From Swiss-Prot:
<feature type="binding site">
    <location>
        <position position="68"/>
    </location>
    <ligand>
        <name>Zn(2+) 1</name>
    </ligand>
</feature>
<comment type="similarity">
    <text>Belongs to the AP endonuclease 2 family.</text>
</comment>
<keyword id="KW-0378">Hydrolase</keyword>
<feature type="binding site">
    <location>
        <position position="258"/>
    </location>
    <ligand>
        <name>Zn(2+) 2</name>
    </ligand>
</feature>
<keyword id="KW-0234">DNA repair</keyword>
<dbReference type="GO" id="GO:0008833">
    <property type="term" value="F:deoxyribonuclease IV (phage-T4-induced) activity"/>
</dbReference>
<keyword id="KW-0540">Nuclease</keyword>
<feature type="binding site">
    <location>
        <position position="144"/>
    </location>
    <ligand>
        <name>Zn(2+) 1</name>
    </ligand>
</feature>
<dbReference type="GO" id="GO:0008270">
    <property type="term" value="F:zinc ion binding"/>
</dbReference>
<feature type="binding site">
    <location>
        <position position="144"/>
    </location>
    <ligand>
        <name>Zn(2+) 2</name>
    </ligand>
</feature>
<dbReference type="GO" id="GO:0003906">
    <property type="term" value="F:DNA-(apurinic or apyrimidinic site) endonuclease activity"/>
</dbReference>
<feature type="binding site">
    <location>
        <position position="226"/>
    </location>
    <ligand>
        <name>Zn(2+) 3</name>
    </ligand>
</feature>
<dbReference type="GO" id="GO:0003677">
    <property type="term" value="F:DNA binding"/>
</dbReference>
<protein>
    <recommendedName>
        <fullName>Probable endonuclease 4</fullName>
        <ecNumber>3.1.21.2</ecNumber>
    </recommendedName>
</protein>
<keyword id="KW-0862">Zinc</keyword>
<dbReference type="InterPro" id="IPR036237">
    <property type="entry name" value="Xyl_isomerase-like_sf"/>
</dbReference>
<dbReference type="InterPro" id="IPR018246">
    <property type="entry name" value="AP_endonuc_F2_Zn_BS"/>
</dbReference>
Length: 297
């Protein structure tokens, strides 16, 4: 089973440090940002410690890693077009970085229309992706399903399908499905995930689904909020998310946890991932999980 979490990539260790963190959680896969998600400053590829990282991954059965593009990249903005060229250039470089790291999927928030309307935003995203993608690239851009907060595009499968249909080299496009986001967008993950997959297959095609973000939600279905909760402690619940992780149609896909760190004060928050991964492997909900996470050294 390909199950892991978001891990950091920083310092001198870079990819090796990410792989070590993932292994410490009992992961078989992981997701990284190539630098801080809130900015676009990036180290050169030769400083990412790729050889040592990949050797460690091989030894510890870690594979199918995912890169997450920074969320400040907005291809959908038709209001402030001066940032468009930069976003296109950055994404092209991100594909090169992902390829060097050995990742075949780059999760990307499609963008926001910032008031111009979804149609204008979709058109602009299509234009951007047509400039970004090239025939020889190996990694796919995995457009993420969004919660529909503000003017986000990708709140429905139809919006993602419209982007995919508009892009010339759309064999380079795939989809990241986030359980919290689609719940908050109005899809019934809790009681009818099979129905959600049927709808996804009809509109986009299950063959495009390449990454799953496994998150519970702090908000009710259809709230358009996007606030992640720890597994089993939100409105989706453990049973449904365990069903997603162990779903027979999703066996080959990396499942990535992006659940919140646990703790009352910011300085002492603890990573939940080792505990949540173990719980999902055991397929039994632990109501005392949050206390156990907080109690770790």
């Amino acid at each position: 089973m390909l199950l892991g979490s978001h891990v950091s990539m920083s310092g001198k260790k870079m990819l090796l440090g990410s792989a070590e963190e993932a292994a410490s959680y009992g992961s078989t896969t992981f997701m990284i940002y190539t630098g801080a998600p809130q900015n676009t400053r990036r180290k050169p590829i030769e400083e990412m410690n790729i050889e040592a990282g990949q050797a460690f991954m091989k030894e510890h059965n870690l594979s199918n890693i995912v890169v997450h593009a920074p969320y400040i990249i907005n291809l959908g903005n038709t209001i402030k077009t001066e940032n468009f060229g930069f976003a296109v250039d950055f994404l092209r470089q991100e594909i090169e970085r992902a390829q060097a790291l050995g990742a075949t999927q780059i999760t990307l928030h499609p963008g926001a229309h910032v008031g111009a309307g979804p149609e204008a935003g979709i058109k602009q995203i299509v234009k951007g992706l047509n400039e970004v993608l090239w025939k020889e690239q190996i990694p796919q851009i995995a457009l993420e399903t969004m919660a529909g907060k503000g003017t986000e595009i990708g709140r429905t499968f139809d919006e993602l399908a419209a982007i995919i249909d508009g892009v010339t080299l759309n064999d380079k496009l795939s989809v990241t499905l986030d359980t919290c986001h689609i719940n908050d967008a109005g899809y019934n993950v809790k009681d009818d995930f099979d129905g959600v997959l049927v709808e996804f297959d009809k509109i986009i095609g299950l063959d495009r689904l390449k990454v799953i973000h496994v998150n519970d939600s702090k908000n009710p279905m259809g709230s358009h909020k996007d606030r992640h909760a720890n597994i089993g402690f939100g409105t989706i619940g453990f049973e449904a998310l365990n069903g997603v992780v162990h779903h027979e149609k999703l066996t080959a896909l990396p499942k990535i946890l992006e659940t919140p760190y646990v703790g009352e004060d910011k300085k002492n928050k603890k990573a939940p991932y080792g505990f949540e991964i173990a719980m999902l492997k055991n397929q039994t909900f632990d109501p005392e999980l949050l206390e156990k996470i907080q109690g770790q050294n």
